[in-house]
Amino acid sequence: MYLNTEVQKNNTYDAIVIGSGISGGWAAKELTEKGLRTLMLERGRDVKHVVDYPTTMSAPWEMAHRGRLPLELADRVPIQRKTGPAANEYGNHFFVKDDEHPYTQIKPFDWTRGYQVGGKSLMWARWVQRWNEDNFEENAREGIGVDWPIRYKDLAPWYSYVERFIGVSGNKDGIKSLPDGEFLPPFELNCLEKHFQKTVANKYNDRHFIISRTANLSKPSAIHTALGRSACQSRNWCNRGCPYGAYFSTQSSTLPAAVKTGKLTLRPFSIVHSIIYDEKKGKATGVRVIDTNTLEMTEFYARIIFVNAATINSTAILMNSTSGRFPNGLGNDSGALGRYLMDHNYRIRVSGIYEGAEFNDSYYFGRRPAGSYVPRFRNLGNDRQKDFVRGYAYACGAGRQGWERGNGNDSFGADFKESMTKPGPWTFSMTGMGEMLPHVDNKIELDPDKKDKWGMPTLKIDCQWHENEDKMVLDALNQAQEMMHHAGIKVTAAFDNHQAPGLAIHEMGTARMGRDPKTSVLNGFNQVHACKNVFVTDGASMASSACQNPSLTYMALTARAADYAVKEMKKMNL
C-alpha cells in the first residue's frame, strides 16, 4: 500500500500536456509560467535544439544520396513523401515511417505526421494569418455546422500575445478579411511580385496581393534574444531545423521558456493510451501511458489535462478513453466526436511566364522564407457567389528560371551550357487554398481489429471533398488565370490535381467547439463539456476551417484556454 501511494505521489503533477508540437508546446509554456508543475508527454523521440538537426548545414555533395531519398527508404514512406520536406534526404527524419504507423483509408486521405519532441513545429510552413470576424460568424449566419462559441474579439488579444512571442514578419496591410497583427519588419516582394501587386490593385477593388506573414524573425526583439533566437538568414533550409532559432518551433521558443521555470518534466517515448476518468469525482484524474521501448504501462495523475496530440491523434485518445460514463469516448455525449474532419483544399496550381521585357535586367537577391499571398475575396462584403459558400486564398511566388530549366532538354555542347549559366525568364505561380466545410460524413473511427505494434487500435479515416469544395476549385482556377493575364503573365500550366484531403497538413475538426453539448464536444474555452478538467486546444477543436493557415489560431486558443484553466483551478472549480 505504501509503495502504491509513493508511486502515485511521484507520478502526480498539477497539469499534464499530451503532445509537444505547436499547441502542446504553448500549453506547457503557459501552464509552467503560471506556476503549475507540468508533465509534457511525447510519443516520439527527443529532439534537442540544434544538436539534433543533422542536415542543417549540409550541402548536397555532403549528403550520401545528394539529397534524394534512397529507394529502400522511399518505399517505406509512400504517404509522407507526397509532401516536399519528407521527399528528400534533408528532412525525412522528422516524418514517420508509414509502415510503422498504419491506418486504413476508407477514402483516400494522406495523413502527414511527425512523431518527435516538437512535432510538426519543426517542419511547418510558418505562414501565420489571423482569422477574421466572418470566419467565426459564418457557421451561424449560413446554418452550416454549429455556431462558434467565441468571436474574433475574444481571440484578438491572444493573437497579439502569441504574435509578440513567436515573432511574425509581415506588413500592416489594412485588409478586413486578414486582420493586422503584431509584426516585425516584412520581407520584401521582388520586382515581378510588385508588378503583380500594382496590377491587382488597379484591376480589382476587392483583392489584395501582399507579402505573406511568416513566423521567421526578420528583426528579433528582446523576447526572442532572451531565448537565444537570432535573425533569419534567409537560407530557406527551414525544414531541416533552424540552428539560429529564427523560425518559431517548440525547440526554439516554447520549450526553453517552459524549462526556464523549473516546472516542466518532459517525457518522450510515451504514447498516451487513454485518459483516466473517475466516475465518483466526475472528472479526469490522469492518463495511462505506454512506454514505446518497453511497452510498460504507467499511470500519471494531474488536476488538469491538455490534449494536444494533433487533431486526429487527440480525438483518437478521447475515443479510446471509455468508461461507464463515456462508453463511446470521453466527452462524446453528442456523437460528434470523430466527425466533421476538415482539411484545406490545395488542389489548383496555375503557373506562367512573364512576357514583358522590363525586368530582364533585374534579379532577386538571395532567398526568402516567405512567399506572397492573395487573401480571401470571395463571399465577403458585396461579393456573393451563387455556386458555393466561403472562399479561398492563394499562395504565390515569383522568380527567374535557373539552370534546372535545362533538365530534359535534348540540347548539348558549349553554347547550351553557356546559355544555362544565364537567368531564364521570370515565372509566376499561384496555389489555391480553399475552405472545406464541416461535413458529418467526414470522420475517423478506431479499428479495434487492427492494432499497431504498441497494441493501440489503428484508425480508419473516411474523408472526401464535396460539391462546395469542387465548385470552389473551378472558380479559383479561373480567377488565378484572369489575374495573371491582367499582369501580362502567359499561363503555361493550369490544373486541378484532384489530390485527396490531407496534403495541406491542416487537418482539423473531429472534437469541435460549440455552444450546445448536444452537438459539440468542447465549450468556448476548449473544455470538454462533460469533463471540465480536460481541454483540447489543437486542430481537433475547430468548428470550421476558414482558408487561412490555422496554426496561429491553435496557439491563441491554447494560450487563452490555459489562462482560463489556471484561474478556474485557483477558484477550486477544477
Q: Where are the predicted features?
A:
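N-terminal glycine-rich phosphate/pyrophosphate-binding loop and immediately adjacent elements
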Residues: 2-139, 144, 149-153, 157-160, ...
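FAD cofactor-binding and catalytic pocket of flavoenzymes
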Residues: 92-120, 124-130, 148-152, 334-459, ...
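Conserved redox-cofactor binding core of oxidoreductases
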Residues: 64-110, 115-116, 122-130, 135, ...
